[in-house]
Amino acid sequence: MTLHKTFGLIALLGSGETSLAGGRIFETIAQRLPRPLRIAILETPAGFELNSSQVAGRIADFLSTRLQNYQPVIDLVPARKRGTLFSPDDPTILKPLLSANLVVMGPGSPTYAVRHLKRTLAWDLVRARFRQGAGLVFSSAATIAVGSRVVPVYEIYKVGQEITSPPGLGLFADFGLSLSCVPHWNNTDGGAEVDTSRCFIGMDRFKNWLEMLPPAHTVLGLDEHTGLIIDFSSGVCTVTGVSSVSLLQKSEPEIHPAGTSFPVDRLGPIHCPDDIEEGIPAGIWKRIQQAEAETDSGSIPSEIQDLVDERKIARAAGDWARSDDLRQRIQALGWQVRDTSEGQVISSR
């Protein structure tokens, strides 16, 4: 099977993934994607929260309504924490990523997202699917996490730790870019008393953070309810939403209002991967090819069958809690299991 390189769209949101402005961005990307529209929402940025499934679930509920004309299949991907049952290295949990043509990550902690995604199976799958045309939408904490350097918002704003600029997931390094992203750029939640601009840390601390960045670095600031859609294939960035985005380099900041566009190389010198497989482990592509082959043949993937068999054993032992847990895991991977008088019946959602 031949792998074809077709970069998807990347949308970075300053905030408001479930707002009117966010909905328009999602629809803009959905219009460009083939059917069926398969959306995977990664829980990782909020994986430390006890209600991380609800955080991602709110986005899922919004998209199921906002994109209802596209009849989306929406899966939550509970890749919450390394070394647990919900690890971002667990191929069973990550199954929806193999066929998703829209991947979404949202609120949480940027530094947590980086710690639990960097050099994982989950993140490599996201990068690979993007090179096959999948759209990527990042908002809030995820917008920060995918850049070259991270603003450790909670650590500075809530805990009072010293200002640092730790490495991020480096999504744009695949294109030769040294780019960091700061959402909530024009935030005013603090009113007249506290400067909460620049993602809540305020202008003074933001300037200190800037001084820690390497040379030839670009910072992308995104106002509230504003987004930037990056199209590497056409070489164009489009600003959408209610306000503007700002580009900070050595010269004076560039401000681009909503409704305008600019060349993608304004983000920095671009070098697109010459080969779709460049920089991504060969095993990732094998997983994707296997998933495509199974979809074409209509067969039940082996990992799904294993979960179904395990559930059968749990039911025979009267372990109903385990049975329900396995059912949920099967559903999270895009399959349904029904109990009949003749046994379990498995079908794709």
Model regions and ranges:
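C-terminal and late-domain segments of enzyme folds
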Residues: 1-37, 41, 45-62, 66, ...
